[in-house]
Amino acid sequence: IQDVLFWMDAIRQSDDRYRTLESFWKGQINSKVWLIEQLKKLPRAHSMDILICGGWYGVMATLLFNSDLYVNRITSIDIDSKCENTANTMNKQYEIAGRFRAVTQDMMTYKDYGGYDMIINTVCEHLTTEQYNEWLNLIPKDKIIVLQSNDYVIPEHVNPMKDLNQFVSQSKLYPIVEPSELQ
């Protein structure tokens, strides 16, 4: 329940409450919960340090902390400077414990990908193919990379995928443990 109280504080304190509330829309929450269910299928023997690229307002981080995955710490980066304070407020108890940090940062210029066990990018549709390829080259080969995209055609989605096959082929990641999609 503590997280819900921090979520409400974050919404109340947000400069753009409507935009912050968008992170709680049914589709947003369902896709994040679905992703966590997929992650539970992966064998993990130790507590992981996770980097979330395009972490927005930090909802994914809170859901990860509340899952039964072994999460040590999470850093959430987002290019939008308005997200940092809201994400830190949403995850206040984890921030206080030193387990969460939100940072205003462009994933294309981020320098510390090597400091994490798992890199999660749930905003692939916001990257052109060229940007995605550049971003992928920044990540050390020994990392677990988790990707999520969608097929929503809206102006800010510069690269929506028409289906899972297109996404898998454009991901350029092998081996792929188990590509799957939320219906």
State where each predicted segment sits.
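Conserved SAM-binding loop of SAM-dependent methyltransferases across substrates and taxa
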Residues: 57-70
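S-adenosyl-L-methionine
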Residues: 1-45, 79-118
